[in-house]
C-alpha cells in the first residue's frame, strides 16, 4: 500500500480523545457540566436528543467550537462557553477500561523506533490515566494542553512538540480524529497526518474531508506497520 506520508519518520504525535480513549469520556463530562449549570438556571437536565443533535452536527462539520454551540443552544448564551469548560474539567477523566487496546499496542510497537509525543487538548489528570493504563513507558514527550499552556489548533503547540522531539515537520506524523484541531493545523506546518475515523470524527466523512489527510484509518491496528516502514531507526 502506498501512503503519501514522510519517507523518513522521526517523530509521531498522537491525540488522546479518539485515538487513545473513547470520546464518550468527554461527552459524559460535558453533559454533567451542562446539567449542573442548567440546574442553577432553574432548568431541567439536557434532553439527550438535543445534545446528540448538536454533538453530531459538530462531528459532521469538523469545524467551529462545540462548547460554544452547546452553550448557545443549551445554556441560552455563548458567553457560558468558558464557564462550561471550567465546570466540565473535574468530570473530564478517562476511567479504567475506556482506552482502545489498539492504541497501547501501537505505542508499544513504535517505542524505540520514533519519538512518541502526546499532543492533546486535555486536563492534567490525563497523564495519570495514561500512566495507569500502561502508556507512560512509551511516551517521550508529554504535550498536555493544561500543563504546557498551548492548545490545538495553535501553531505554537505543534512547534513546541517539534522542538521537544528534536525534529522537523517533514519527518513527523500527527495522529488525530478531528480535521479542525488535528489534520489541518498539522498539515499547515508540513507535518504528515493520519486521521482516525472514530470518536469525534464524522460517521460518514465526505470525499473532500477524506482528501484532507494523508491517510484515513478506521482504527490504529495498521498504523504501526505504516510508520515502521518509514521509521528513521
Annotate each PLM feature.
Residues 1-12, 82, 104, 108, ...:
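Asp-based, Mg2+/Mn2+-dependent phosphohydrolase catalytic module
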